[in-house]
């Protein structure tokens, strides 16, 4: 009887672990009511004012800004600060924790870059760090220091630190 109970317990734990690990890829929120065929083979990219919708969170990049710094916070010679303002909405029934260091990974012209404290002080309307109550939003900046002649900034965003699913936001330098 003990072996049967132990076997059932192990099976239940295995199914629970598999169920927790299943996560869906983000979907692009449609701007219009017409829906075309979606091709899930190619990875989706998102841009300004496009929403990546995961099962529990919705990420929308709402603004891109470039700065040469202010006060004591200036980039190295030949660099600029770039900030992307995001609105993150909690779609779940549970509180969600956001960390700009753990959920975001940046690349400038295919070279890894990291979140910059100095850049974030320039874009001082808040960071993308904190807890979001169910149905509420978090608005803040993800900021990096990049070469002044940058062409493409790519941000890969995870919906949780336990997930492998990500959305890729791509921004072009129009200056």
Language-model segments: what does each one mean?
Residues 20-175:
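Conserved functional micro-motifs across diverse proteins
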Residues 11-12:
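Repetitive helical segments and hydrophobic/amphipathic motifs
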Residues 15-19:
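C-terminal motif of bacterial Sec signal peptides marking the signal peptidase cleavage site
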Residues 1-4, 8:
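Positively charged n-region of N-terminal signal peptides that target proteins for export
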């Amino acid at each position: 009887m003990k072996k049967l109970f132990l076997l059932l317990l192990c099976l239940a734990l295995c199914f629970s672990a598999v169920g927790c690990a299943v996560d869906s890829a983000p979907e692009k929120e449609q701007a219009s009511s017409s829906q075309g065929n979606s091709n899930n083979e190619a990875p989706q990219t998102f841009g300004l004012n496009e929403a990546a919708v995961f099962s529990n969170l919705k990420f929308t990049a709402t603004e891109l800004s470039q700065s040469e710094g202010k006060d004591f916070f200036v980039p190295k010679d030949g660099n600029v600060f770039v900030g992307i303002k995001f609105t993150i909405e909690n779609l779940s029934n549970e509180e969600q924790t956001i960390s700009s260091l753990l959920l975001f990974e940046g690349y400038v012209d295919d070279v890894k870059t990291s979140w910059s404290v100095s850049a974030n002080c320039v874009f001082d309307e808040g960071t993308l760090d904190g807890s979001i109550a169910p149905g509420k939003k978090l608005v803040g900046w993800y900021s990096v220091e990049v070469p002044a002649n940058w062409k493409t900034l790519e941000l890969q965003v995870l919906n949780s630190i336990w997930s492998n699913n990500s959305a890729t936001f791509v921004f072009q330098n129009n200056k």
